């Protein structure tokens, strides 16, 4: 019987099964199917996916993230905060500020420590990718996708698309409590205009530094929070003149709040909690 030790952690209720690949060995060919199995709340552990904390040649640690459908994502904001917490608390890094490698490049983490435990984490997520080709999205000629008409099943919408290393499309709504998350979300996730699929976000603007946010995630469906999605929502809101550049913006997600700033230098900074739920051994 094969097995590996895991730590279940969450960022605002967006939980993953974390595996320390400095200590565990799992065949590459099994990673996708294992992500599906461990995510199952009935026959597995229960989570939005699986995250591997791996050795890296360019940073103290590398994060790989697998959604609950087994697809591998290229970035994960809530995951990065939990990886930073894990790395610091397990002595994998000595400084409170350090780099983490992702499939979409290097990001910088800064942990807040109280009595030896990481209570909050800031991630410099780097620059958003705004070109249509970088999302990626196919369709009109305009280089960026900002307030673009978008038809779905004969209904007209307006979208803005942003990549944080992974693809996001933002719909603005008047009332977040009635956003079509579970009806429009799964349709747009697989829309052919997004060749790699897309994370689908719904945003209600409160004022120039406050948003309400819900998400249908590519590969995981409805989650309590999406860190990269919240970053994309802030960038989209600045591009649409709805929130202020270089100003801390509170994003209210179902699982709690993130503080996000798109700085004048161009980077997106995200601050929020990261929590450990439990540890255990998974048999497969
Ligand atoms: N579903 C995403 C990966 C997880 C992102 C999200 N959980 C976050 O916190 O950023 C994707 O396939 O791009």
Curated annotation (Swiss-Prot):
Protein name, entry field: Diaminopimelate epimerase
SUPFAM superfamilies documented for this protein: Diaminopimelate epimerase-like
Subcellular location: Cytoplasm
Alphabetically ordered keywords of this record: Amino-acid biosynthesis, Cytoplasm, Isomerase, Lysine biosynthesis
Recorded metabolic or biological pathway in which this protein acts: Amino-acid biosynthesis; L-lysine biosynthesis via DAP pathway; DL-2,6-diaminopimelate from LL-2,6-diaminopimelate: step 1/1
Catalytic center residues: 76 (proton donor), 226 (proton acceptor)
Summary of the function given for this chain in its UniProt record: Catalyzes the stereoinversion of LL-2,6-diaminopimelate (L,L-DAP) to meso-diaminopimelate (meso-DAP), a precursor of L-lysine and an essential component of the bacterial peptidoglycan.
Superkingdom in the source lineage: Bacteria
GO CC aspect terms: cytosol
Catalyzed reactions per annotation: (2S,6S)-2,6-diaminopimelate = meso-2,6-diaminopimelate
Gene for this chain: dapF
EC code: 5.1.1.7
Keyword Transmembrane helix among record annotations: no
Family named by the database record: Belongs to the diaminopimelate epimerase family.
PROSITE patterns per record: DAP_EPIMERASE
GO terms classed as biological process: lysine biosynthetic process via diaminopimelate
A GO term, aspect molecular function: diaminopimelate epimerase activity
Pfam families membership: DAP_epimerase (PF01678)
Entry binding sites for substrate: 14, 67, 77-78, 166, 199, 217-218, 227-228
Sites marked Could be important to modulate the pK values of the two catalytic cysteine residues: 168, 217
Assembly mode: Homodimer.
